[in-house]
Amino acid sequence: PIYPARGLIRLEDGTVIAENIVTQGLYIKSKLFKTSRDQIEKLYNQVLDESRTFDQQKLQIKDEEKIWLVKNLSEKELARYEVQKNTIPSIKLEAKLKRYLPHRNLFSHVIGHLGLISSNERLTLSRAEYPSDSYIGKVGLEKSSEKLLKGTAGISLLEVDVYGNKVREIQRTTPDKPSNITLTLDFKLQKIAQEELANRRGAVVALDPMTGFIKVLVSSPDYNPNILNGSENGLSVLQTSMEEAPFFNRAISGLYPPASTIKPFIGLLGLEEKIINETTIVEDKGFFQLSEEGRKYRGWKEDGHGKVNLNKAIVESSDVYFYELASKLTIDRISSFLLEFGFGEISGIDLTNESKSILPTRNWKLGNIGEAWFVGDTINIGIGQGYIS
């Protein structure tokens, strides 16, 4: 098979954020593997860096004629191989294209990474298109756009001699070129968001308010996809600390309370239901009570905001105003209203592993918590807390 180079991923200004580079690898033909142990030992002792370890079980691929010993030689390793290659004739050098992100971690949670194809994946895919040493999209755009980015393999039919050496090419079918993808992300804004997060846990998503196009999507901590793509050497995934979950895309997979961002929606619903108007005044003393003896729902500002109307309540983010408003609404009406704005749904972004948000109802709480819905639950929803996420 002749495999086309994987499609490029660019930004609208032409900046390439995912491309392909040539790397040098070493392989041995499967039929020579058992009889060439001395050559393999010499390779690891005299050519490869000390960090390389030989794992026969990992290398043994029974259904392919090649066994890859190393897939990404450093310049020093390549130089040592050139010196020693006549003493290890069974081990051959071959150039391969590898996926490469020139900006490494910056777009890791958008682009994602490739990985060695699994046995389960091979069951549903063409073996001609995906031999056992293939790299395939595992997450992010690399996975969701795998078919677009991969293209279709061509074929080169060769005549070989008794030793397997090429004599001539009999027939060639040109591979179909893959598609390139252009993203709406803004490089400078993406970089600023990454730097401000400084590898602390968090996420930043920014949309163009006029078009809805995503300009920033950053999740932190992040990781270097090139190590998993095989285009750079580095610590394996197993050696990477998992405590901070660098592979978890907090921007689309994490579920968090919407908090005060929900207040304009609750205010709009209050206007629609004619419970309030733009001049309705609420006395914010720093807490709200349904009754004199009832629980106090405290606002973020201890001494309150004083007399507030809807505009001031949104500008100063008065919790008490929205506690009181939510207490006059029902969870049924709140849920149905928020559903119209996409709450409780997935956005449909063309990335993998997006989590569906939680928009609670009476039945949801009964089924998931095993309890009835209380007015206090509705009050918490009014400021984007409680069961909503």
Regions found by a protein language model. Give the residues of each.
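Beta-lactam-recognizing serine transpeptidase/beta-lactamase-like catalytic domain environment
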Residues: 18, 160-169, 209-260, 265-389
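Sequence/structural segment immediately N-terminal to covalent heme-attachment motifs in c-type
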Residues: 206
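Extracytoplasmic/periplasmic proteins that interact with beta-lactams or build/remodel peptidoglycan
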Residues: 1-203, 218-250, 255
